[in-house]
Amino acid sequence: MQIALLSEDPNRQSELEAIATRWGLEHDEDNVFALVLTDKQLELRKRDEPKLGAIFVDLVSGAVAHRRKFGGGKGQSIAKAVGLNKGATPIVLDGTAGLGRDAFVLASLGCKVQMVERHPVVAALLDDGLARAKQDAEIGVWVAERMSLLHASSHDALEQLMAQDDFVQPDVVYLDPMYPHPVNKKKSALVKKEMRVFQSLVGADNDADALLAPALSMATKRVVVKRPDYAEWLDNQKPSMAIETKKNRFDVYVNAAMA
C-alpha cells in the first residue's frame, strides 16, 4: 500500500523503514495520508486537513486509562457480552481490532486477546501502541502476557489460524465492523475525527457480513458483535441475545455455555 512515510526524528529513519517493510508500505510523497514517526510514537495524519490532528494508539494514558480505572470493571456491557460476569476468563479473538481499545479493556479484565487487523496502516499504528504499552511500568507486564497482534484480513485469518496445528481455538470471537455513520447522530469530537479519517483511508466495511460464519465456526463458546443501536444484525442473523447500551448494542451468538 502507498502512503507518505515521514520521520520527524532523523535518528529513527531506519525504524520507519523497518515498519514500512514489515507492513508492506511504500512511500508516496504526494499521498494525502502520512504515516509519521515522531520522537514519541507512530501517527497517522491527513495532510489536506491538518486541523484533524494526528491519530495514534495510546493504551497508557487518556481516555483508555480512565476507562480501565473507572469504567465499571466486569460489570460493563462488553464484559458481560463476552461472558466475564459468568466467572470465566475467556480467551478472545478480536477479529476487527482497529485501535485496540475494546481489546485493551478485555485484557485489563484478565482475558487473553489475540487481535486481528486487516489494514496495514491501522495494524502498524496498533503495533506501535502495543510496543509502547509493553514498556509501561504500570501495565506493561500484563499487556505483554495478554495482548498479541496478527495482521491479516479477518476472513482469511480465521481460516488460516484454524488450519494451524498449534492453534488454540478462542472461547469468544469479538467483532466490531466499521458501520456507516448517519449525519444526525452525535459522536464525541475524537470519535468523529477518527471515523472521518479511517473511513476515507480504509473505506466502508462492505464485506463485514462475511465475518460471521467463520467466527461462529471458530468460537467454542460465543461470538459477540458490537453494533450501533440503529444497525441491523450482522449478515441478517438474529443473535441469541443482545446487551444494549445508550449508543451501541452487543449482539451475542451463543455456541455453548461459558462454564
Swiss-Prot record:
E.C. designation(s): 2.1.1.242
Subcellular location: Cytoplasm
Example of a GO MF term: rRNA (guanine-N2-)-methyltransferase activity
Keyword Aminoacyl-tRNA synthetase applies: no
Domain of life: Bacteria
Catalytic activity: guanosine(1516) in 16S rRNA + S-adenosyl-L-methionine = N(2)-methylguanosine(1516) in 16S rRNA + S-adenosyl-L-homocysteine + H(+)
SUPFAM superfamilies: S-adenosyl-L-methionine-dependent methyltransferases
Record-listed S-adenosyl-L-methionine binding positions: R101, D102, E117, R118, S153, S154, D176
InterPro entries to which the protein is assigned, alphabetical: 16SrRNA_methylTrfase_J, SAM-dependent_MTases_sf
Gene Ontology CC terms, in alphabetical order: cytoplasm
UniProt keyword terms in alphabetical order: Cytoplasm, Methyltransferase, rRNA processing, S-adenosyl-L-methionine, Transferase
Gene3D superfamilies xref list: Vaccinia Virus protein VP39, YhiQ-like domain
HAMAP family hit by this protein: 16SrRNA_methyltr_J (MF_01523)
Entries under PANTHER family matching the protein: RIBOSOMAL RNA SMALL SUBUNIT METHYLTRANSFERASE J
Family: Belongs to the methyltransferase superfamily. RsmJ family.
Function of the molecule: Specifically methylates the guanosine in position 1516 of 16S rRNA.
This protein's name: Ribosomal RNA small subunit methyltransferase J
Gene name linked to the record: rsmJ
